[in-house]
Amino acid sequence: MKISKIALKNKSLLVNKCLINGKWVGSKKTFKVHNPSTGDLIAEIPDLGKKETSAAIDAAEKAFYLWSKVPAIERSKILKNWHKLVVENADDIAKILTTEQGKPLSDAKGEMNYAISFIEWFAEEAKRIYGDIMPDPIKNKRLMALKQPVGVCAAITPWNFPAAMITRKCAPGFAAGCTFVIKPAEQTPLTAIALVKLAEDAGFPKGVINIVTSLEPEEIGAEITSNIKIRKISFTGSTEVGRILMKQSAPTLKKLSLELGGCAPFIVFEDANLDHAVQGLMLGKFRNGGQACVSPNRIYVQEKIYNTFVKKFVTEVKKLVVGDGMAAKSTMGPLIDERAILKVQDHIKDAVKKGATVETGGKPHKLGGNFFEPTVLSNVTKKMKCASEETFGPLAPFIKFKTEQEVIAYANSTDFGLASYFFSKDIARIWRVAEAIESGMVGINTGLYANSGAHLPFGGVKQSGFGREGSRYGIDDYLEIKALSFGNIE
């Protein structure tokens, strides 16, 4: 199987095999991974199926009965080893990430810092899985609640944040005593494999962490959802696929964490600090080329400041440098593939047809390939696709509003509820809006919710899914509560 050279200090990180039960396995059947910036072939990766996935699940189940009995302090030490190795190799993994995903190297390094925070956090949380003792109304009885690991877990991760989604899902599971089968996105398997390689080096016993790759995820997904040995699935991706996984998992009653699509509103009130709001929107909207589930998708600006704010924002957008993620000057890389380009074009075409104005951008970039111009649309209305559908690209549509009540209604007029953002200096308004907006996460006077790392819970409501990752709540989805009742205590 072919694999290209990437300038790494630790060349052992670039692996095009899968880890199953402590053994690195290849396959005669492979698929190709390309660099979205250049179109160059990076590697040929094993195209595995049901047989290999079943073997990985069996290995994880066998390992679970040993790993779950390892003292929490020892699991913590192994997680700390993993943390240390990922920190030492973060720059190399960032290069792999940029090569296969496209985002600027500086952004990839930022993602690595975010990914690392979850390993560090849950290495400590492993030692803090506490139960409870409850008073019993009956004399000579005692009641207790224990927390135990849920069992074998599957992590199905996306291409847009291929490092962070591995650690955000696996670190709390490992801390709890769970074992894993990981299925990374077919566009970005090398980043995930590198992290798994370092986990193996850190001392995780064989079978505790397994990874399977495939060009056609349906076969692996069907095995994961139907196999009774899998007790929990954590998935980040589209709402459409999340529904399929949930339906397929119903017969085996699996525990699910689903972080799905978003259509985030970004609101700028007339009392806001406009410069802060512009910078917040720039960071949130064009990070990863808009290819983030929490990316601002609908931008509402109060009518009194609308023209001023749009003008300020367009000035900043024109400063973005589109290019290969490995180029030092690039501040925005390519989209992941042609399908992503076509969706952005469709949303722009629909908006312009219905009366929107292109303030800047609006077409594929002169670099060609998967590159697209950062685009700003004004005079957008709620009848346009970009105001109701997730674009997942570098498109910023501006909508005018009059009152607070009106914009809250606009913000909540969607089936999704992952992230939202607003800027205001009025403390009373801040409380009202924060409580009224229907989303799992709210950024207040900031355009980046997730840059706080593992400290804050991450997850949505409505059709954006359920479950929380990160923070002290993040380990709960990997635990079951067992009630103990003691009698005849004299």
Label the predicted regions.
Residues 1-38:
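Hydrophobic face of amphipathic alpha-helices that form TPR/SEL1-like repeat modules
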Residues 38-44, 230, 267, 321, ...:
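Conserved C-terminal structural/oligomerization subdomain of aldehyde/semialdehyde dehydrogenase
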Residues 39, 75, 97, 119, ...:
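Residue-level signal for inorganic ion chemistry
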Residues 40-129, 140:
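Glycine-rich loop-to-alpha-helix module at the N-terminal edge of alpha/beta enzyme cores
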Residues 41-48, 63-69, 155, 266-269, ...:
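Short, well-ordered beta-strand elements within core beta-sheets of diverse protein domains
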Residues 64, 68, 83-90, 94, ...:
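Structural signal for hydrophobic packing residues in well-ordered secondary-structure cores
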Residues 131-276, 401:
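Rossmann-like NAD(P) dinucleotide-binding subdomain of oxidoreductase/dehydrogenase enzymes
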Residues 240-381, 444:
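ALDH superfamily catalytic-core signature
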